[in-house]
C-alpha cells in the first residue's frame, strides 16, 4: 500500500486512525502544555496550525492510544482528561457584523448542550465565561481552550475600518473571558496568521505568551530538513524518478521551492508542509501553497499606500514592527511578513534589526505573477503568456517587438492607479523584469527616477536605461558615459544599448533609442 499524505487533513485522530504519515511534533507539544498556561502562535496559512490544535485536543482528552509510538507516549505518565473548548474561526466568510456573531453563537450553543446554560448570562462573551466555569465545576478539571485562526474576521475586514472595529470589540470581549475565568483554565492556545497591535483583541490578556518568534518552538509547525530525511527519504527517490532528476537534484529543487521559512534569527529553515506533501503525493513540483489562497488584501495594501515593490527585496526592520499589525499604519510589511510572503533572512545583533526577503521560489514567483495583472494592463489569464513572450523576444533579439509589448502593459491604466506615476511605472517594470528573471539573467537598479537594467541571454546582452520625463537620447548618453557596456567588451554576444523615456503625460513609453555594439 502506498503512503498516505495528510494533504489538508487537520484532524489528528482521523489522521492516526486512517494511517496517514505524521511528522512527530509531540515532544514540543508536551513541553508547551506543561511549561506555561496562555499562548499565542502566529504562522502562515496552511502551515499546520489546525493539526497542532487538534493534536493538543486529543492529548488533553487523554486519548493515549492515538500517541502509540510517538514521543508523547513516553513523556506523559498521567493522561489526565480535561474538558476542551475548541473554537475554529476558519470556516466562515466574514463580511457583516452578524457573520462573526453567528459563528460564536453556534459554538456557544454547542458547548451549552454539554455544560448547561444560565438565563442570567446575556451575550456570547458572558455565556462563554459561564461555560468555562460550569465545565470546570462539573468535571472537576480545569478547562483547555483552543482557538484556531482567531484573526480570520479581522483579516477579512482589512480596508473596512468600521467592520474591523466591530469585530475587534466582539472578539476582545469574547477572549476577555480567559482572563476573568483564569482559575478555571488549565491551558489556552490561540493561533492565527497575524497579530494585531494597538487596541488589540489581546489587550486584556497581559499574561499571553507569544511564542511566534521563540527558538524553543520554531519547529512546532512546518517540516525541517532533518524531518524530511527521517520521514520522506523514500519519497524523495520516487519524486526524483518521476521527474527525471537525480536524488541530489530533487533535494535541491525541494529546498529552492519550499524551504526558507525562518521564524527567529537563529532558527533553521522550515519547509512549507502543504506544498511539500502535495509534491510527494503528486510526484511533481508545483505552486501548491500559493494557488490555495491569493494575497488580494496584501496587494490592496501595497497599491493603497503606493508602495515601491522593489523595496520588498531588501527590507530592514525591528521585532516590534514584525510582532504586531496596526490597522491605522501605512506600512504593509508586518501583514506581508506575518502572512508568510516574507521571512527572516538575517539579523543584526548590534542594531537588533531583521533583514527580510521571500522565503523560496514558490512564494516569490507566485507573488510577482499575482502582482502583474493587478498593476499592468493585462488580464489574469494572459499574464503568464505575456511573460513567456517577453522572454522569447529577448532570447531572439527582437528588440522592437519587446518594447511594443511593453507599451501595451502601460496602456489603459486608470488614472487612480497611475496617480503616483513614478512609483507606478517603476513597479510595473520591476514586476515584469522580476518575472523574466526566473528565466534569464536580470540585474535591476533604481536611482532618482532612473532605472538601470542589464538583461543577459545566451546570445544577447541588453543594457537599458529608463528615464521619466527626460529623453531617450539622455538615457543612451548615460549608458555611454558610465561605461555600462565595458564589462562586455570581449563578450561574443550581441550587445544592445537602449535608452527609454517614459512620459508622465502619456502615462506610457514615449521614445526608445537603440544602439548596437560595445
Q: Where do the language-model regions lie?
A:
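Domain-level recognition of nuclease-like catalytic cores that cleave nucleotide substrates
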Residues: 487, 491-518
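Active-site metal-binding core of divalent-cation-utilizing nuclease and nuclease-like domains
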Residues: 135-139, 432-458
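Structural motif
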Residues: 144, 460-462, 496
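Mg2+/Mn2+-dependent nuclease catalytic core
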Residues: 164-169, 468-485
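Metal-dependent nuclease catalytic cores in nucleic-acid-processing enzymes
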Residues: 174-181, 334-342, 430-434, 478-498
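Conserved catalytic cores of phosphodiester-cleaving nucleases, focusing on short active-site segments
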Residues: 429, 451-468, 482
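Phosphate-binding site recognition
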Residues: 1-421, 436
